[in-house]
């Protein structure tokens, strides 16, 4: 009888759900990895655009069950246009999310995303930041952390956006701004002298992103060629030439 009571008590303890919130300074990764304890991670989304990175993978159906009508986007490419560096995102809602990967999330309403560790496909606390460069000398890193980050000069999406319609607006952080766990931000690691702003672009497809970046690179590489006296020459001419202010030997 005493053994049955002990087993029953243990089962109740295992079935009891422990809630943790992504608004705390640091995620309890050790607790979330326990197989004998059901843990529910709660992450608040404002209406509009948010960012998200989780330590486990979820299918599209699991994401749909965790929060209503979310749109998930991933960073697919970057390209400078004029003085603005465009960050191209594509819809990947149908793919769900991968552990440690940063995403852009659109939520039509303010709501909580609630996920239990027992429902996740796998647990992986390795952060997989996305780093991209363009042909103008810009390099961007899109990443997250499992604890709060205070960093001057990091770019992020403000918690509340006083904009209609709601847009994915980026702001450069000051010393008093904090990125809480599971939020993602952009680091402008290398900045071209002519680039002054960052802008998020919601592309219709990966094919569109490829077409934009390829066309821009072709335009740059097919520019006019000059000899050392400043005279325009054929791009197939042999010898030392100048293209876009750089010496080229052919």
Where are the regions a protein language model picked out?
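Bacterial N-terminal signal peptides
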Residues: 1-8
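Sec/Tat signal peptide C-region and signal peptidase I cleavage site
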Residues: 9-13
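A short, polar beta-strand/turn micro-motif
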Residues: 14-66, 90-210
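A glycine-rich, hydrophobic loop/mini-helix early in the fold
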Residues: 62-85
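Hydrophobic beta-strand positions in blades of beta-propellers and related beta-sheet-rich domains
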Residues: 72, 170, 223-225
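C-terminal outer-membrane/trafficking sorting elements
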Residues: 76-79, 207-250
């Amino acid at each position: 009888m005493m053994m049955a009571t002990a087993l029953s008590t243990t089962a109740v303890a295992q079935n009891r759900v422990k809630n943790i919130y992504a608004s705390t300074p640091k995620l309890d990764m050790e607790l979330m990895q326990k197989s004998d304890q059901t843990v529910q991670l709660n992450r608040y989304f404002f209406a509009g655009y948010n960012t998200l990175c989780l330590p486990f993978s979820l299918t599209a159906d699991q994401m749909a069950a965790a929060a209503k009508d979310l749109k998930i986007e991933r960073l697919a490419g970057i390209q400078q246009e004029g003085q603005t560096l465009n960050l191209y995102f594509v819809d990947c809602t149908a793919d769900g999310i991968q552990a440690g990967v940063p995403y852009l999330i659109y939520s039509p309403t303010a709501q909580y995303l609630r996920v239990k560790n027992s429902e996740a496909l796998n647990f992986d606390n390795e952060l997989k930041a996305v780093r991209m460069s363009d042909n103008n000398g810009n390099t961007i890193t899109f990443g997250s952390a499992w604890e709060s980050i205070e960093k001057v000069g990091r770019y992020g999406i403000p918690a509340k956006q006083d904009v209609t319609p709601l847009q994915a607006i980026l702001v450069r952080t000051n010393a008093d701004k904090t990125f809480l766990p599971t939020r993602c931000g952009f680091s402008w690691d290398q900045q071209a002298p002519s680039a002054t702003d960052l802008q998020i672009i919601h592309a219709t497809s990966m094919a569109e992103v490829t077409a934009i970046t390829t066309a821009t690179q072709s335009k740059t590489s097919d520019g006019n060629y000059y000899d050392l006296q400043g005279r325009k020459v054929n791009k197939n001419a042999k010898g030392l030439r100048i293209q876009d202010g750089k010496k080229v030997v052919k």
